[in-house]
């Protein structure tokens, strides 16, 4: 049986203060996730603004995540993707050497590899480490789609590739993957379809909303994994509006604004080209948040 990291996972935001990484603030956010029942955290992914972090900042985030989760049940699935295979390998090796439990590796963006190129890319990454590797398919951002046959080929050929974070927005894709390979771990990468994916055999979620509502995301996921689908759906229905507003602008713009409004980060800062949400959207985010019980530190 393959070693896997699954369940309720949070795609962590990266807080900044005066343009620099807010290390103390980052640690506080992680401790709050641990306290509220999350199974794993995902530092330096899309939501963590990995594209605009320096390599040093990327590594510091992983180190803080590993150190903060030490001696807890919470796993660290470190973001370690790149559109250059050698760089993705370097990041994967760093994550493993510094104690990450696994890595999340986004499909190479911009250079649009073929399916064979994707296979070779991921096979090189998997061969470079022993920890679990989760593929990350998000064609809307990368311009590159890891097709089901490539996912299954990698799952069968690489011992430590255990599944895929599916953020294509297609429930059919997830059903198709599981129909062809029931042992594959399919994780939802879009909060709006967490419940449909979980109720069709998905093994967890990598959530943006759980930055704000980790307890609710954990409860939804755990109910679904325990086959208590009515309870899971009740929570999913309650989360509908907040999940929707979190994508009123490009992620992670809305979730960072929400975290600031909730007092969970000290300053609302992004790295350009990301910038503050519009005044109208900021008001909508704030209004939507009033319907939810947001736990503090």
UniProtKB/Swiss-Prot annotation:
Q: Which PROSITE patterns match?
A: DHDPS_1 (PS00665), DHDPS_2 (PS00666)
Name the catalysed reactions.
Answer: L-aspartate 4-semialdehyde + pyruvate = (2S,4S)-4-hydroxy-2,3,4,5-tetrahydrodipicolinate + H2O + H(+)
Q: Which InterPro entries match?
A: Aldolase_TIM, DapA, DapA-like, Schiff_base-form_aldolases_AS, Schiff_base-form_aldolases_CS
Subcellular location(s): the record lists:
Cytoplasm
Its UniProt pathway annotation is: Amino-acid biosynthesis; L-lysine biosynthesis via DAP pathway; (S)-tetrahydrodipicolinate from L-aspartate: step 3/4
One term under GO cellular component: cytosol
Q: Which residues bind pyruvate?
A: 47, 206
Residues with site note (Part of a proton relay during catalysis): 46, 110
A single Gene Ontology MF term assigned here is: 4-hydroxy-tetrahydrodipicolinate synthase activity
Keywords recorded for this protein, A-Z: Amino-acid biosynthesis, Cytoplasm, Diaminopimelate biosynthesis, Lyase, Lysine biosynthesis, Schiff base
Q: Which CDD domains match?
A: DHDPS
| Active site annotation, chain numbering | 136 (proton donor/acceptor), 165 (schiff-base intermediate with substrate)
Pfam families documented for this protein: DHDPS
| A GO BP annotation | diaminopimelate biosynthetic process
Q: What class of enzyme is it?
A: lyase
Instruction: Write down the Gene3D superfamilies for this protein, in alphabetical order.
Output: Aldolase class I (3.20.20.70)
- So what EC number does this one have? 4.3.3.7
Disulfide pattern: none
Primary location group: cytoplasm
Spell out the SUPFAM superfamilies in the cross-references.
Aldolase
UniProt xrefs under NCBIfam families: dapA
Q: What is the stated purpose of this protein?
A: Catalyzes the condensation of (S)-aspartate-beta-semialdehyde [(S)-ASA] and pyruvate to 4-hydroxy-tetrahydrodipicolinate (HTPA).
What's the subunit arrangement here?
Homotetramer; dimer of dimers.
- Family that this chain belongs to: Belongs to the DapA family.
Q: Would you tell me the protein name for this molecule?
A: 4-hydroxy-tetrahydrodipicolinate synthase
- Native organism taxonomy: Bacteria, Pseudomonadati, Campylobacterota, Epsilonproteobacteria, Campylobacterales
């Amino acid at each position: 049986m393959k070693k896997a990291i699954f369940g309720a996972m949070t795609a962590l935001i990266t807080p900044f203060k005066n343009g620099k990484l807010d290390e103390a603030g980052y640690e506080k956010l992680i401790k709050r996730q641990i306290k509220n029942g999350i199974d794993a955290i995902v530092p330096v992914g899309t939501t963590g603004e990995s594209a605009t972090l320096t390599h040093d900042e990327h590594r510091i985030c992983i180190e803080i995540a590993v150190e903060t989760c030490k001696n807890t049940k919470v796993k660290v699935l470190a973001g370690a993707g790149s559109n250059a295979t050698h760089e993705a390998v370097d990041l994967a090796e760093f994550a493993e050497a510094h104690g990450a439990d696994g890595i999340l590796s986004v499909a190479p963006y911009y250079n649009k590899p073929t399916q064979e190129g994707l296979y070779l890319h991921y096979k090189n990454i998997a061969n470079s480490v022993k920890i679990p590797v989760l593929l990350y398919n998000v064609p809307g951002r990368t311009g590159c789609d890891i097709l089901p046959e490539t996912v299954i080929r990698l799952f069968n050929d690489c011992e430590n590739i255990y599944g895929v974070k599916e953020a294509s927005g297609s429930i059919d894709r997830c059903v198709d993957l599981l129909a062809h390979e029931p042992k594959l771990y399919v994780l939802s990468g879009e909060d709006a379809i967490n419940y449909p994916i979980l109720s069709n055999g998905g093994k967890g979620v990598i959530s943006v909303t759980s930055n704000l509502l980790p307890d609710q995301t954990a409860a939804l996921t755990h109910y679904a994994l325990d086959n208590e689908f009515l309870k899971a759906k009740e929570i999913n229905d309650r989360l509908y509006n907040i999940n929707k507003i979190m994508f009123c602008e490009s992620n992670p713009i809305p979730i960072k604004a929400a975290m600031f409004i909730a007092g969970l980060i000290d300053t609302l800062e992004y790295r350009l080209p990301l910038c503050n949400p519009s005044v109208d959207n900021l008001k909508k985010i704030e209004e939507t948040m009033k319907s939810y019980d947001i736990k503090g530190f």
